[in-house]
A protein has these predicted regions:
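Short consensus segments that form the blades of beta-propeller domains
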Residues: 50-52, 122-123, 155-160
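Buried hydrophobic residues that stabilize the cores of well-folded domains
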Residues: 31-52, 101, 143-152
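Contiguous, well-ordered beta-strand patches that form the walls/edges
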Residues: 41-46, 59-139
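C-terminal motif of bacterial Sec signal peptides marking the signal peptidase cleavage site
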Residues: 14-16
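Edge beta-strand at a domain terminus
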Residues: 139-171
Length: 171
């Protein structure tokens, strides 16, 4: 009996290491190169003002390697960012160490003079780590989203800015 238990123990350990089927399917769909469509950044200071900044990212390719846990962003043949990729669940991923993300995810030319200091403060507080909700993933469409509240101070004025960030990608 003891030998049977010892033989079955490694088998049971292997079975318990399997990922749930829905996570495996999401990893299969996510893995590979995704071509940028658009990023929309919505900055909101509740009760004061808000501004919506959609911009094209058709020159950007995001490579999600779910096997090795890496995320690489390429623009016109040049790597502009790289990070670790963590699969948190079938609907949440984390990108860790994408230190240049603000550079490629905001179009600075669309942000007015008042918004520039806000962007600079977001940049100063950004760690390169972000948790994304997967709003939609199919074989040819990916929509990622996060929202975050960031305290911002400009010339003595302080407000909690909400950043709602949505990325649209296609295979």
């Amino acid at each position: 009996m003891k030998k049977l238990v010892l033989l079955l123990l490694p088998f049971l350990a292997l079975i318990s290491c399997r990922k749930p089927e829905n996570v495996q399917r999401m990893e299969e769909l996510l893995h590979g190169d995704w071509h940028g469509v658009e990023i929309t950044n919505h900055l909101i200071a509740q009760g004061l003002w808000d501004t919506l900044h959609p911009h094209s990212i058709t020159d950007v390719i995001a490579s999600f390697d779910t096997l090795n846990g890496t995320f690489i962003v390429d623009s016109a043949g040049t790597t502009v960012d790289s990070a670790s990729l963590v699969i948190d669940s079938d609907s949440v991923i984390s990108v860790l160490g994408a230190v240049n993300a603000i550079d490629w995810s905001f179009d600075r030319t669309m942000i007015n003079g008042f918004g520039q200091p806000v962007l600079q403060q977001l940049e100063a507080q950004f760690t390169g780590n972000q948790k994304f909700k997967i709003l939609r993933i199919t074989e040819d469409e990916l929509i990622l989203y996060f929202d975050e509240v960031v305290p911002v101070s400009i010339q003595g004025f302080t407000a909690d800015m909400e950043l709602r960030h949505t990325e649209y990608w296609q295979k």
